UniProtKB/Swiss-Prot annotation:
Its main location: secreted. InterPro entries: Beta_defensin_dom. This is Beta-defensin 112. Keywords: Antibiotic, Antimicrobial, Defensin, Disulfide bond, Secreted, Signal. It is found in: Secreted. Has antibacterial activity. GO terms for cellular component: extracellular region. GO terms for biological process: defense response to bacterium; innate immune response.
Length: 113
């Protein structure tokens, strides 16, 4: 897996975590049945929509991801993938703040730090 793809994925997880007080979308997918079982015993039902989750982070549900995209998870069924476009490393909006690693500087995502 390319470094750029890995960093984009980490940025998406951080972005989602900051906008929600609960765990990341990927953790919810892994622990969904655990939460549903607990909720049912309390009389509440939790619905996890993979399609809505995919589109919430800018992904698209498709049968096959393009070369410029990477697959995060499947959508409604295992043959439909959540495809997210790779970030452009020359766009400053795609840079990650170094304060996430202890400083206040910015660096391009594809550089080694």
């Amino acid at each position: 897996m390319k470094l750029l793809t890995t960093i984009c994925r980490l940025k998406l997880e951080k972005m989602y975590s900051k906008t929600n007080t609960s765990s990341t979308i990927f953790e919810k997918a892994r622990h969904g049945t655990e939460k549903i079982s607990t909720a049912r015993s309390e009389g509440h039902h939790i619905t996890f929509s993979r399609w809505k989750s995919c589109t919430a982070i800018g992904g698209r549900c498709k049968n096959q991801c393009d070369d410029s995209e990477f697959r995060i998870s499947y959508c409604a069924r295992p043959t439909t993938h959540c495809c997210v476009t790779e970030c452009d490393p020359t766009d400053p909006n795609n840079w990650i703040p170094k304060d996430s690693v202890g400083t206040q500087e910015w660096y391009p995502k594809d550089s080694r730090h």
